[in-house]
Regions:
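N-terminal metal-binding scaffold of metallo-dependent hydrolase/deaminase domains
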Residues: 1-54, 66
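C-terminal cap of metal-dependent C-N hydrolases
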Residues: 20-22, 381-436
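Active-site gating loops and adjacent loop-to-helix segments of metal-dependent hydrolytic enzymes
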Residues: 83-113, 161-176, 235-265, 288, ...
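Alpha-helical scaffold segments that flank or form the walls of functional sites
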Residues: 85-155, 179-193
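Glycine-enriched alpha-helix->loop->beta-strand junction motifs that scaffold or abut catalytic
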Residues: 154-156, 220-225, 261-264, 281-290, ...
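His/Asp/Glu-enriched, well-ordered alpha-helical/loop segment
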Residues: 258-265, 307-396
């Protein structure tokens, strides 16, 4: 089995940084090494020490002077929306009805689903993303195509077919029973196969009847180790419509709460307009509020109050995500940049150490997967991104005046995109250069 020895400036986080000067929250090696074998990081530290453990047969790839970090993690994205990203002029509910739902009906075709699933995952790799929590369409074939493509690439993914039995067009609705049956079959076929993990996925309360929400709760009780993902409190019209459909609920969050869908593996996309009671309910259950800045800005949904949610008496667990195709970029670097701006509009700041922690270890913690991904710790899965802070002329001229690691990270998140991603390693193997036909030459 080939052993790969990477050399470069290695950076990983030990905990959430408390500010731009909190270097105790990270481990940085100016001349670092990572030894990869069998899809895992088997040694990490100063290059000289790791090289001594590698043996003469290790293949060396020298990435100096670039930064080597854990692969970026996207905690909310829609695979079937690749061909409606950048669709003009609608708020959430109109956008779904005008663009998204008609597009997702195409995923009843297994060939189409397979094509888009492969393109979607390859695009993430180009952007340095190594794990995604993904929504497939309502069709079982869509989820099968996604998991098959991810398994072939040995990518760790969390995904599920959406459950939706109302307020959607013909060809995009299931039933409570068919949703249960399809989900059970997909769990049996894919959960734990290789690096694939299943998420029970009621799209949102508007598109599920109470009977289907009961089914989602039953699935969670039957499979308490699974993730659950849905949408919550994204848009004022969405909230009002939800409460019309569930008049007995105290608020939007209570709809999910009464069906047993809150918990530490529950991922709630958006969470922009939460009441204090709702935020308390999420916090007490350990549920995750997923920040989707490019989508929230593009659809005019509102501003996620990231710092307030984290600092409140009962803090929320948070994650960061692209939400493509409502989101406007597959890049977590671009998403971090837009997140910074959203937080600034609330009169706060998110420092670059905090941004990169969130997109790596922080998102891994949100997925309850930090023992496997999100760090460069020995024993972790070898999902890695190599970033070049001088990837473009404008980045190079700015870098001439940089004097700290934090400034370099801020440059990467402000001006960086897929061009800054030198290489993406998935399960210990180079993945981006293979896509681009530019496999890194060993030295």
């Amino acid at each position: 089995m080939t052993r790969l020895l990477l050399r470069g400036r290695t950076l990983t986080f030990l905990r959430r940084p408390e500010g731009v000067g909190d270097v105790a929250a990270l481990r940085y090696e100016e001349d670092g090494g990572l030894l990869l074998e069998g899809g895992r990081i088997v040694a990490a530290g100063p290059y000289a020490e790791v090289e001594a453990k590698a043996g003469a047969d290790a293949e060396i790839v020298d990435h100096r002077p670039n930064l080597i970090l854990p692969g970026l993690i996207d905690t909310h994205a829609h695979m079937p929306q690749m061909q409606v990203i950048a669709s003009y002029g609608a708020e959430l509910l109109d956008w779904l009805n005008k663009y998204t739902f008609p597009e997702e009906t195409r995923f009843s075709d297994p060939d189409h689903a397979r094509r888009i699933a492969g393109l979607f995952l390859d695009e993430l790799v180009r952007q340095g993303t190594t794990t995604v929590a993904a929504y497939c369409s309502v069709h079982r074939a869509s989820a099968e195509a996604f998991f098959s493509a991810a398994h072939a690439r040995d990518m760790l993914t969390v995904a599920g077919k959406v459950m939706m039995d109302r307020n959607a067009p013909d060809g995009l609705r299931d039933t409570p029973q068919s949703a249960y049956d399809d989900t059970k079959a997909l769990i049996a076929a894919w959960h734990g196969k290789g690096r694939q993990l299943y998420a029970i996925t009621p799209r949102f309360a508007i598109t599920s009847t109470p009977e289907q929400m009961e089914v989602a709760g039953a699935l969670m009780r039957e499979h308490p180790d699974l993730h659950m993902q849905t949408h919550l409190s994204e848009n004022h019209a969405e909230i009002a419509f939800t409460l019309e459909l569930y008049p007995e609920a105290r608020d939007y969050t209570d709809v999910y709460e009464r069906y047993g869908l809150l918990g530490r593996r529950a991922l709630f996309g958006h969470c922009i307009h939460l009441s204090e009671r709702e935020a308390d309910a999420l916090a007490e259950s350990g549920s995750v509020a997923v920040f989707c800045p490019t989508s929230n800005l593009f659809l005019g949904s509102g501003l996620f109050d990231y710092q307030r949610y984290r600092r409140r008496g009962r803090p929320l667990r948070t994650a960061l995500a692209t939400d493509v195709g409502g989101g406007t970029n597959y890049s977590m670097l671009r998403t971090m940049d837009e997140g910074y701006k959203v937080i600034a509009l609330s009169g706060e700041k998110l420092d670059p150490l905090g941004s990169f922690w969130q997109a790596t270890r922080g998102n891994a913690e949100a997925l309850s997967l930090v023992e496997r991904i999100g760090t460069l710790d020995e024993g972790s899965d070898a999902d890695i991104v190599v970033l070049d802070s001088g990837a473009t002329p404008s980045m190079r001229i700015r870098r001439e005046r940089i004097t700290s690691l934090a400034e370099e990270l801020f440059l990467l998140q402000t001006l960086g995109d897929d061009r800054a991603v030198v290489e993406t390693y998935v399960s210990g193997r180079p993945a981006k250069s293979v896509l681009d036909g530019l496999a890194a030459a060993p030295v």
